[in-house]
Amino acid sequence: MKVCPSCQRAYQDDSLNYCLEDGTPLERLRSSSEDQTRLFSPDAAPTLRHVPPVTVNERPQTRYAKSGDINIAYQVLGDGPVDIVYVPGWVSHLEYGWESPLVANFYRRLASFSRLIVFDKRGTGLSDQTSDLPTLEQRMDDVRAVMEAADSARAVVLGMSEGGNMSLLFAATYPERTIALITFDVFAKREWDPEYPWAPTPAQRQGFYDAIEKEWGGPIGIEDIAPSLAHEQSVRDWWGTYQRRSASPRAALALARMNTLIDVRSVLPAIRVPTLVLHRTDDRDVNIEEGRYIAARIPGARFVELPGSDHLVYAGDQESIFREIESFISNLRHAPETESVLATVLFVELAGPHTATESAPDAGRLLSLAKRETEWFKGRTSKAANGFLATFDGPVRAVRCALSIRDGALRAGIETKSALHTGLCNIEADETSGAAVDVSVAMVALAQPGEVLASSSVKDLVSGSGLRFEDRGVHDLDNALGQWRLSVVKGDLN
């Protein structure tokens, strides 16, 4: 892998010697033991982009990126040596956010040492409204679409609150696009669990839903998310208007319900990029233990506890946040390209006993069908000694591909069984290896003919997709692969 020392654009093609953006000679990334130089020097040259730079004293123009058939509103501010993609929380509105001096200061301070890219998630603010609930997978696609529209090959991803969940998943799935990951007051799960006791109980979440239905348009939740500002009428008025402009009551309620289903705990060990976890000590909305939990499970993550009780990143003491972020980014060092990525592995095999002679025709037809469906669902086919193996960067696409392969094979008179698991993989050319492959292969032995089995790592990441599951309990795959809760995919409501 090579990188431009001027604009930091990364290139996988080792045959390239000069940057396609500005003609600067490319440098090969070396391991940290070989190269201890900082990735971004204080006097690094400004990045040359197709998007015109906007000074920190201006309000940036709102532009649109195309993510599938959805338009995602985004803005670019500043022209620093590193891109930062800011992923907002629950709801947002790009242009009305600037009406708050606190939000404006937050954006401008970040843009003083970076090129800041901000956007409204699909279904909120100035981005297209959608009839279906957005999945984390679709929201990851939106981040990629915005980065591509802004000519950003790699960026530091900064996620706030609910935006941190998709940031965690993005960093694990696309380490080649993620220079580093920063989270602020983020949770890994949004509903109480014996192994995650800090999250709100179902009754507490229901109380929040009731407040949205009855009080949307007022400053809902400001006493918990910004207690230091809750007494200021101007802030209360701005927050109420900001919420109204960000989402309708129905959309806000649907997004809140979807957030309750979020569970990214299984993703954390798969993150392989430099990570900074920031959390305020007395955050009333997301307990500080949730930040500690996340940091403890991301290899090499740095946890910083900040004083204060405000959940909103732009409320309370902003300067302590900027100091930590700027110091973290300025001390990033060149790192070797990671070989491991988070992916959803699909393994399919013929069901029932067959001799080699009997199964050969069916195996050939299954392989042809599976390859075609995998391409349609944007997956990647890999070699497999027995059966069919494919990987996907999105679990929803993987599940729907598995259902499509099963149904297509059945129409052809071929019975199959399949298994899906999301985890770390090593993907090289047409070969895939790693624990995620081993787990999916072991799982398929537990599937009945015609079944598609999914591990909890898949089920937890597809909230809002309309996919239905039936629990099959916890199974001990073997001593090396551990125990996994498995479910049968029962269908798709969409």
Functional labels for PLM-detected ranges:
Residues 389-493:
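Catalytic beta-strand-to-alpha-helix segment of the class III nucleotidyl cyclase homology domain
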Residues 70-126:
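Conserved HGGG/HGGXW glycine-rich cap/lid loop of the alpha/beta-hydrolase fold
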Residues 168, 172, 177-212:
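Flexible "cap/lid" loop of the alpha/beta hydrolase fold
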Residues 137-155:
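Conserved acidic catalytic loop of the alpha/beta-hydrolase fold
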Residues 335-404, 408:
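Catalytic NTP-binding/metal-coordinating core of nucleotidyl cyclase/transferase enzymes
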Residues 215-258, 267:
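Conserved alpha/beta-hydrolase catalytic His-Asp/Glu region
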Residues 271, 277-279:
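Short beta-strand/loop motif that positions the catalytic acidic residue
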